[in-house]
A protein has these predicted regions:
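Flexible, charged surface loops at secondary-structure boundaries
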Residues: 31-36, 70-78, 101
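Compact, well-ordered interaction domains used in eukaryotic information-processing assemblies
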Residues: 43-90
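Generic recognition of cysteine residues
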Residues: 24, 42-43, 140-141, 157, ...
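Polybasic, proline/glycine-rich intrinsically disordered low-complexity segments
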Residues: 90-156
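N-terminal "first-domain core" detector
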Residues: 1-51, 60-62
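Generic detector of well-ordered alpha-helical segments enriched in charged/polar residues
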Residues: 52, 56-59, 63, 93, ...
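Short acidic DE-rich linear segments
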Residues: 156-177
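Surface-exposed acidic, glycine-flexible loop patches that form ligand/cofactor-binding
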Residues: 70-73, 154-158
Length: 177
């Protein structure tokens, strides 16, 4: 398939708020899906120590700066933070990727490429893998990651969500029997 279109957002300074790593690199891109955007924030800290100290701060910034401005639930659910960090140990990767607050997180043990085409290839293949995983696992796990949305303005949307959760629960129950 053809490479999907990526749009780059130039203003990433706000995403660096409270991050104590002067040299951290952040790239914020949006990828057009059917009728919405997937938001992807790529980041590389100076070293593993810096990643450990600062990753939560970046997650908070993304939540404040990116997610709070989005109106569509589907876009709010499709925010990814990709941490590029060579030599990072398993426990740190696990810790970050299991964190369900507000965005989905991926840790890649490699340098973040300066070349945009290479970066896009890595991101596309990674997101594609995740999509396959999600389709295979079929469980409804995204709701607890959405605690940060304090109120749904739209009752209809809440009903949709409830319906979705019920369907997931129903499927899970039927699989057991």
């Amino acid at each position: 398939g053809k490479m999907r279109d990526y749009n780059y957002i130039d203003d990433v300074e706000v995403l660096k708020d409270n991050i104590l790593d002067e040299d951290c690199k952040i790239i914020y891109m949006k990828q057009k899906a059917e009728d919405y955007f997937i938001h992807i924030i790529c980041c590389q800290f100076t070293d593993v120590e810096s990643l450990k100290m600062n990753w939560k701060e970046l997650v908070n910034n993304v939540s404040e700066v990116v997610q709070k401005r989005l109106n569509d639930l589907i876009e709010i659910y499709n925010v990814y933070i990709v941490f590029f960090q060579p030599q990072v140990e398993d426990s740190v990767v696990y810790n970050i990727e299991q964190n369900k607050y507000s965005s989905r997180k991926i840790v890649l043990r490699k340098e973040m490429p300066d070349d945009k085409t290479k970066l896009e290839q890595i991101i596309s293949s990674k997101l594609f893998d995740l999509k396959i995983e999600k389709e295979n696992s079929e469980q409804c796990c995204f709701t607890d990651s959405m605690d940060f949305i304090t109120s749904f303005n739209d009752e209809n949307c809440e009903k949709e969500l409830e319906k979705y959760i019920e369907e997931c629960a129903w499927e899970a129950m039927n699989e057991k029997n």
